[in-house]
Curated annotation (Swiss-Prot):
SUPFAM superfamilies: LexA/Signal peptidase, Winged helix' DNA-binding domain. Represses a number of genes involved in the response to DNA damage (SOS response), including recA and lexA. In the presence of single-stranded DNA, RecA interacts with LexA causing an autocatalytic cleavage which disrupts the DNA-binding part of LexA, leading to derepression of the SOS regulon and eventually DNA repair. CDD domains: S24_LexA-like. Homodimer. It is an enzyme of class 3 (hydrolase). The lineage of its organism: Bacteria, Pseudomonadati, Pseudomonadota, Alphaproteobacteria, Hyphomicrobiales. Keywords: Autocatalytic cleavage, DNA damage, DNA repair, DNA replication, DNA-binding, Hydrolase, Repressor, SOS response, Transcription, Transcription regulation. NCBIfam families: lexA. Disulfide bonds: none annotated. InterPro entries: LexA, LexA-like, LexA/Signal_pep-like_sf, LexA_DNA-bd_dom, LexA_repressor, Peptidase_S24_LexA, Peptidase_S24_S26A/B/C, WH-like_DNA-bd_sf. It comes from Beijerinckia indica subsp. indica (strain ATCC 9039 / DSM 1715 / NCIMB 8712). This is LexA repressor. The active site is at 158 (for autocatalytic cleavage activity), 196 (for autocatalytic cleavage activity). The record marks 123-124 as: Cleavage. Belongs to the peptidase S24 family.
Length: 237
């Protein structure tokens, strides 16, 4: 269910697209909804996108598309429907497509992607695999490589020498392979997830901590599935 402001913004975008074929600017949205700042509009846009009412299109200024209205009988068209199987993560992920940077301030505000926070990841003893997102965070596309991404909250101190601390939020690019030395989300025996540095030792896979207080764990290749590679980190002070 949408809030009053979310519904008003969705209707405004829909009507403007019908009239002109071009979505309204953030300033026009702000004025139409009588808000004081564009940051409020940004949050509303993110909420509508997360709920499947609008979609952002790559490589186009003001690239907003209305997918459905609240009273529509048809379900929203999923922008990306692939899932991990089997996996530590399920559901739609934040997708970043190759893009060219915008120079216009207004356009750059629309080049933000909603990244789902899928729970906690152990940087210590592996914890049970997590599959349900708790909320989303908005990140500029320029911060991320192309691909699908998700975020995890770090629990533990086994990666502190790599600059990854307890309570950090790590941004993971979804992929099922990685290079030697990459920091990855590894799913062990389809049950436990951990954040470690990947090392290949012959036919075995070593999951290496970045803290001398922890031991490297070695597994056969059939016991470890790569769920993604670390690409960014967020820390709150």
């Amino acid at each position: 269910m949408l809030t009053k402001k979310q519904s008003e913004l969705l209707r405004f975008i829909h009507e403007r697209l019908k009239e002109t074929g071009v979505p309204p600017s953030f300033d026009e949205m702000k004025e139409a909804l009588d808000l004081r700042s564009k940051s409020g509009i940004h949050r509303l846009v993110m909420a509508l996108e997360e709920r499947g009412f609008i979609r952002r299109l790559p490589n186009r200024a003001r690239a907003l598309e209305v997918v459905r209205l609240p009273d529509a009988a048809t379900p929203p068209v999923p922008p990306h429907g692939r899932k991990f199987s089997p996996s530590v993560i399920e559901g739609d992920l934040g997708r970043v497509r190759p893009h060219t940077p915008h120079t216009d301030d207004e356009d750059s505000e629309l080049t933000t992607v909603a990244i789902p926070v899928m729970g906690r990841i152990a940087a210590g003893t592996p914890i049970s695999a997590l599959q349900h997102r708790s909320h989303t965070i908005g990140l500029p596309m320029d911060m991320l490589p192309a691909g699908e991404h998700y975020a995890l909250e770090v629990r533990g101190d086994s990666m502190i020498d790599a600059g990854i601390l307890d309570a950090d939020t790590v941004i993971i690019r979804r992929q099922d392979n990685a290079e030697n030395g990459d920091i990855v989300v590894a799913l062990i025996d389809d049950e436990e997830a951990t954040l470690k540095r990947l090392r290949r030792r012959g036919a075995s896979i070593a999951l290496e901590p970045a803290n001398s207080a922890y031991e490297t764990r070695i597994f056969g290749p059939d016991r470890v599935r790569i769920q993604g590679k670390l690409v960014s980190l967020i820390r709150r002070y």
